[in-house]
Amino acid sequence: NVHDPRSGEIIESHICWYHNVMTLVHDWYMIQAGTLDEAAQKMKYDPELMGQLIRFVSSHEVGHTLGLRHNFGSSSTVPVDSLRSRSFVMAHGHTPSIMDYARFNYVAQPEDNIPREGIFPRIGDYDCWAIEWGYKPMFNAYDDVSDHFELEALTSARLKDNRRLWFGDGETNRTNDARCQTE
């Protein structure tokens, strides 16, 4: 990213797309969703499915350009039995953050009747909260110290009401926290 040092405004962003990403997402989907989606069992995916796979990876990368870090801890807030609940997965997704490496809902079984939308990661509760926290003007504070205290109070209140907003990157903080496994 290229930022304006005076305001922090993002002026320009770059997303690197490696030559093998298409093969990588194909293989991830085949292995992790092959029992749930017959289309995942093919050696060549139709353009619609490949487009969904590209949008999933692109959403994660755009999150980085907006300043979001990996959030490997968010998935630890989802009870495992909820991953097999069609109503839960359709309402909340299988991970609270597209910034996790949760990939696909491979816990779901064919008898759970979870459609493709419930298998794919999507922008979740944590991602929306992180963008709001970082970009939405929320306070009448005129200095960084006051703003900091107001943000801390708001964060504590939000986490109390929604544990899916929990953050743990497993990289710069909580490196020994089992809830923040990377892969």
Where are these regions (language model features)?
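Catalytic Zn2+-binding segment of zinc metalloproteases
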Residues: 62-78
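Conserved catalytic/binding loops enriched for acidic/polar residues
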Residues: 75-183
